[in-house]
Structures are given as structure tokens and as C-alpha cells.
Amino acid sequence: MLEQYVKKILTSRVYDVAVETPLQTARQLSERLGNQIWLKREDLQPVFSFKIRGAYNKLTQLSDAERARGVVTASAGNHAQGLALAAKVLGVRATIVMPKTTPEIKVEGVRSRGGKVVLHGDSFPEALAYSLKLVDEKGYVYIHPYDDPHTIAGQGTVAMEILRQHPGRLDAIFVPVGGGGLIAGIAAYVKYLRPEIKIIGVEPDDSNCLQAAMAAGERVVLPTVGIFADGVAVAQIGQHTFDICRDYVDEVITVSTDEICAAIKDIYDDTRSITEPAGALGVAGIKKYVEQRGVSGQTLVAIDSGANVNFDRLRHVAERAELGEGREAIIAVTIPEQPGSFKAFCEAIGKRQITEFNYRYNTGSEAHIFVGVQTHPENDPRSALIASLSEQGFPVTDLTDNELAKLHIRHMVGGHAARVSDEVVFRFEFPERPGALFNFLNKLGGRWNISMFHYRNHGAADGRVVAGLQVPANERHLVPAALAQIGYPYWDESDNPAYQLFLG
């Protein structure tokens, strides 16, 4: 099987539109990690993503009759832009079905390259179903974003370039994984020619379809998929791609949202370029691999796979990057509600930089303050800060990994609502598009009074809300069924310490 793919890769016609991207050393990251780190800069492609390779190679394999019918695909962005440009160069009509939640930068990217955009549904499965309907109705040829041998071969040209650009020692290549087209192509080429090189997939911990399939020994469908790294938000690994990955991918690492944000900053520090969340997975994976294995002196390559990110999402990335690096702690600290307490607390913090401070007067004998403090993962870790404050008589609750605190509570500190009774608190995610907030409130209905509400647009595909509902005790059993009818993911946060300390 590998030999067949290598032949396809060597004969792929990608360079009519794609460029050979540089393999660039990440000097600062290399020094920090004690390993030689290289970035394969696929964000420098004409469509700012590696996807142009597979899309163009697939189109070149179509017959004249198939090209005349026109092509269609479903995509949330990068494959769509790659196919639009490939079709334009080859003179083929391309229709791209995209979810209504697709970032505007990707929609405009498709239109500017000559693709016809059809916005349909709130998720990729809905867009996919509609694109297949167009295949039946219009006779279009469907171009799969990853699960096709010619697409896989096109993506495999990335590996061909890496081995040519770095013929010396190479210990591992870290590859972002969504549907698996990129890692399958890279694994096929590298394992045929240089089997000693490890191929390591990297996925978000809430979108790990390859890891789940490898563990099960077969393709599985994830019940839910996180969409922060929207470029790899895939519920099931492809069949063709898994056939390769099962035998030739050495391992899969998963990383958190905060770790992805930290990796985006790392890439920026070394290259002064901004990558999209999915594009930073390789670097995030290298950092975790080095930390967990304690390796040093190795040569490691990360595929920087794309840079199609909405500018307004960078606010969220900046907020979370220091947390992912272990350079900031988010804590709740209890101090006496009396003059001089603030000063005593600041003295206890010492020379550490305070990055965030939220407080509202409380009528009780104790005050709870929401604080961000700069830390250092090695010289002054979070654990040392918490231990120091506790020893000096300041009770601390660590909120660094608390999503409710990071997304909502930090913007809401304002005191307890003493006269609010029977309050239960839920966190929701819903598809982000114009009118989405109104639609969410409409679905929430009016059975129970809304006692608290916070929404913030993160420039992402999902809107995030925390809501307090006044539900009498004898009606609590009705809540799960009522929320299930809304149809959006939700989490019960009523017992969350951040809520209890600051708002409950």
C-alpha cells in the first residue's frame, strides 16, 4: 500500500498552484525546550493552508466529462478555499457548501477565489448532507476534503519536501489531525523512505477522533466535537486515512485549548506570524511530548498547517495563552472584609505581577477576590503561589482550569444576589451567527425566571452563555428535559466554586 501512495505523491501535480514552503527553525522555542524545533510553514501557501495541495491534485485526476459537470464540497473553510482556487485555475465550476457558523474570513476567501458559496445549516454534517443532495440534483462531482487517495497523495507532498529540505537526522514529525488526510499522506511517504522517523498525530482533547479510533482498533464517531480548533473539528476519522494511520502513525497526543493558545503565541514569538488554532497543534504537541518524555537534543518538526483565523478570535487566544504556558494562575482568594486587607494581600503576593484583579464590596465578614497572577512553570509555579498564600493565612481556590471562571465569572464579579432564591446555573454553547443570541433566548423560553445572564462573543463558531434560572425545588426534575429540548450542549455549574464564591 505504501509504495502505491509514494508513487501517487511523486507524480502529484500540486505545484501548478501550491508552493514549496520553507522548513524554518524556531530558534526561541528550540532554546527553551532543549531540542531542535522546525516549523513546516504551510500557512504560507496561496490559500494560507496545506489544503490547496490535495484539492488541486484531486481535480487533476478528473476526466473532462467530470470537470464539465462541476464540483461540490462541504467545508468549514480551508478545504473550501483550496478547492475554489484549484477549480479556478483549471476552469472548473465549484460550489462550496459551508455551515452558517463559518468565520467570515473563510467565506470571503472562497468567494474571492471564484467559488460559489452556499451557506447551509449550523454544523458540518448539515452542510455535508446538503452538498450530497446537490450531487443528486445537479450531477456535481463531490470532492472529499480528506478521505480520498488522490487528496491524501496531494497532502503527502508536504513530507516529500521535508525529507528533501532536511536530509539529516530527524526524530519525529508532529502533524495536526482532523479527518486524517495530512497525517496519512505524510505517514505513507515517510514510513516508506525513513521508517525510523516517528509520525505523531496531535488533536484537541475534545476532538480526538484518531486517538479514539486507534484505541478502539476501528473508526468510531465522537458523540461531541469541540470547535475551538475548527480546522480539525471532525467526529470520525476517514476510512482511507485510518487504513494508513492504524499501521504507520506511532502515537497520538491530545492538547487543551489553553495549550493551543500558548502554541499560537510561541509561533508568533519565533516567526511574527499568527496561525489558526488547528495550525498550532503540531507545536502544542511537541511541547507536551518534550515535557512528558523529558527528551533533549532531538530534531522535531511541527506542521504549521494554516493561518485562516478571524482577527476578533485573537482576543480569546491572548487571554488563554499565558494559562496554557503555565505563566498565569487564576485564583479566588478569601480576605477579611476590613481596612488593610488589600494591602496585606498584595504584600503576600510579593514581587509577582498581578495580571487581573476583580473585587466588589460584600456585607459579610469575608471578601472573595478574583485574581490573575503571573507565574513561571519552573522558577515560580502555580503550586508555589498557592502554598505561599495559604501559609500566610489566605484561603485559596485554584480556578486556573475552571472554564466557568475563565469564560464568564471574571467578567461578572459584582457581589451576591441576596434576594434571589432557587437559582440553578447552567453554561451553554450554541452556533454563533447573526441572531443566534435571540434564537437561544427564544428557545430558553419563559417558564422560569432568568436571574443571571452573561454572553460574550469570542469570534468563534460557538456562542458561550452562562444563565441562572429560578427553579423551585419541586420543579428541578423538569429541568433536564426542558434543556434537552433546546438542543444545545450544556453543563450544570450550580456547584461550581467560582459561582459559589462570587455570584451564588
Regions found by a protein language model. Give the residues of each.
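PLP-dependent amino-acid enzyme catalytic core
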Residues: 1-436, 440-504
